Amino acid sequence: MSLNAEIKASIVADNARCANDTGSPEVQVALLTAQINHLQGHFKEHAKDHHGRRGLLRMVSQRRKLLDYLKRKDVQRYAALIAKLGLRR
C-alpha cells in the first residue's frame, strides 16, 4: 500500500528546496498527499477497512499540522505549495 521508491524520489525531486532536501515541510506534505491519494482508491474498493481508514485519518491530520506550520512560518511557500498540489485551501 505504500509508494515505491521511484515515485517517492520523483516527488522529493519535484518539491525539494535544494539538492539534498528530503525533510522540508513541502516534501513531507507532497509525500503525504501522494499517499493519501493512493489510499483513496483503496477505500473506494474496500469501504469496510476501518483499520486502514484510521491510518488515513492520521496521515490527513499530519498533513494538516505540517500545512499549518508552513502557513505560520512562511505564507508565500504555503501558498505556492497549495497551488502546486491542488489542495483546496
UniProtKB/Swiss-Prot annotation:
SMART domains: Ribosomal_S15. Pfam families: Ribosomal_S15 (PF00312). Keywords: Ribonucleoprotein, Ribosomal protein, RNA-binding, rRNA-binding. The keyword Coiled coil does not apply. GO terms for molecular function: rRNA binding; structural constituent of ribosome. GO terms for cellular component: cytosolic small ribosomal subunit. The keyword tRNA processing does not apply. GO terms for biological process: translation. PANTHER family: RIBOSOMAL PROTEIN S15, BACTERIAL AND ORGANELLAR (PTHR23321), SMALL RIBOSOMAL SUBUNIT PROTEIN US15M (PTHR23321:SF26). Belongs to the universal ribosomal protein uS15 family. Part of the 30S ribosomal subunit. Forms a bridge to the 50S subunit in the 70S ribosome, contacting the 23S rRNA. One of the primary rRNA binding proteins, it binds directly to 16S rRNA where it helps nucleate assembly of the platform of the 30S subunit by binding and bridging several RNA helices of the 16S rRNA. Forms an intersubunit bridge (bridge B4) with the 23S rRNA of the 50S subunit in the ribosome. This is Small ribosomal subunit protein uS15. It comes from Aeromonas salmonicida (strain A449). The lineage of its organism: Bacteria, Pseudomonadati, Pseudomonadota, Gammaproteobacteria, Aeromonadales. The gene is rpsO.
